[in-house]
Swiss-Prot record:
Pfam families assigned to the protein according to its UniProt record, in alphabetical order: CRLF2-like_D2, TSLPR_D1
Annotated spans, Disordered: 322-347
Induction: Up-regulated in activated peripheral monocytes and THP-1 cells.
One cellular component (GO) term of this entry: receptor complex
Stretches of the chain found on the membrane's Extracellular side: 23-231
Family to which this protein belongs: Belongs to the type I cytokine receptor family. Type 5 subfamily.
Notes on the domains: The WSXWS motif appears to be necessary for proper protein folding and thereby efficient intracellular transport and cell-surface receptor binding.
Intervals, Cytoplasmic compartment: 253-371
Upper classification of the organism: Eukaryota, Metazoa, Chordata, Craniata, Vertebrata
Residue ranges annotated for the Fibronectin type-III domain, each copy included: 118-211
Annotated signal sequence range: 1-22
Disulfide bonds: C71-C84, C180-C218
Protein name as it appears in the record: Cytokine receptor-like factor 2
């Protein structure tokens, strides 16, 4: 049957297109829909906007050599004809039809009826549970080349899951017996046999099952929990933060060590003004030019001089000219015995040591000697 349908389908498509184009002017503004219900009844409906308030008539035949018959079972919409129902049980025929306004053809065409097949909804659907799987069965239809599709979902699923077989014996595995599942079944015609214009059957009634027992309904889908920061993400973030901190600390330590081992070299331009700007780095010319105008640069933070330089005046004179001295008895005895006066020795402190004429002096930065 499948091969025959495909072979005849191509011929009828070309023939139907030629016949429709032959009446192209009359077909303007008319849209049709054909549904072949379970290979039993053909329904042809039309939407003629140009003839919305007109009772159009439908004429048909199943053989190109026969005369047209007029429809006897019209569909009405707002009191006007909008379609026709034809009895065509188990027929693989071409439907020739013409929609007319009185005797004037409005739309004329021919179509292979099985191209618009719509199977009936599955009947006698049964469920057989075994552990974590369920087998769905129903009564097979009298014709073949069909797909039986079972869809199911639990309140925790966001979309329907689907499985289909060539016969109405579909086993679904991997189910959780503690969950409640909703099921429904439908039948579809194979596209490679009947073409792309067929219609799937209506869905069967929804059936709910839990723990192998039928339920009136499944609970509503629970609200998904708010996303929480997982331990892995938290630990990873802390590890990255620690690594970055250690890296920054290492760079700071490296900078400190580099600064300690390799001190910064001062810029000679600030120490020798004019050496490079005026003398082009010639130190001999620079020292000649600046030897009489050298400035004393004090170090920053150096102690300010507290006063003028203190002169240290040394005068060599006779000891007899000195003023009378008061001597104690022990001193007089030592002098009388011819010994010289010995002063206690104390360490010299303060600065540079200068010896002049047997006298020793300690000089600081604010002293000078005048002879």
């Amino acid at each position: 049957m499948g091969r025959l349908v495909l072979l005849w389908g191509a011929a009828v498509f070309l023939l139907g297109g030629w016949m429709a184009l032959g009446q192209g002017g009359a077909a303007e503004g008319v849209q049709i829909q054909i549904i072949y219900f379970n290979l039993e009844t053909v329904q042809v409906t039309w939407n003629a906007s140009k003839y919305s308030r007109t009772n159009l008539t439908f004429h048909y035949r199943f053989n190109g050599d026969e005369a047209y018959d007029q429809c006897t079972n019209y569909l009405l919409q707002e009191g006007h004809t909008s379609g026709c129902l034809l009895d065509a049980e188990q027929r693989d025929d071409i439907l020739y039809f013409s929609i007319r306004n009185g005797t004037h053809p409005v739309f004329t065409a021919s179509r292979w009826m099985v191209y618009y097949l719509k199977p009936s909804s599955p009947k006698h659907v049964r469920f057989s549970w075994h552990q974590d799987a369920v087998t769905v069965t129903c009564s097979d239809l009298s014709y073949g080349d069909l797909l039986y599709e079972v869809q199911y979902r639990s309140p925790f699923d966001t979309e329907w899951q689907s499985k289909q077989e060539n016969t109405c014996n579909v086993t679904i595995e991997g189910l959780d017996a503690e969950k409640c599942y909703s099921f429904w079944v439908r039948v579809k015609a194979m596209e490679d046999v009947y073409g792309p214009d067929t219609y799937p059957s209506d869905w069967s009634e929804v059936t709910c099952w839990q723990r192998g027992e039928i339920r009136d309904a499944c609970a509503e889908t629970p609200t998904p929990p708010k996303p929480k920061l997982s331990k892995f993400i938290l630990i990873s973030s802390l590890a990255i933060l620690l690594m970055v901190s250690l890296l920054l600390l290492s760079l700071w330590k490296l900078w400190r060590v580099k600064k300690f081992l390799i001190p910064s070299v001062p810029d000679p331009k600030s120490i020798f003004p004019g050496l490079f700007e005026i003398h082009q780095g010639n130190f001999q010319e620079w020292i000649t030019d600046t030897q009489n105008v050298a400035h004393l640069h004090k170090m920053a933070g150096a102690e300010q001089e507290s006063g003028p330089e203190e002169p240290l005046v040394v005068q060599l004179a006779k000891t007899e000219a000195e003023s009378p001295r008061m001597l104690d008895p022990q001193t007089e005895e030592k002098e009388a015995s011819g010994g010289s006066l010995q002063l206690p020795h104390q360490p010299l402190q303060g600065g540079d040591v200068v010896t002049i004429g047997g006298f020793t002096f300690v000089m600081n930065d604010r002293s000078y000697v005048a002879l």
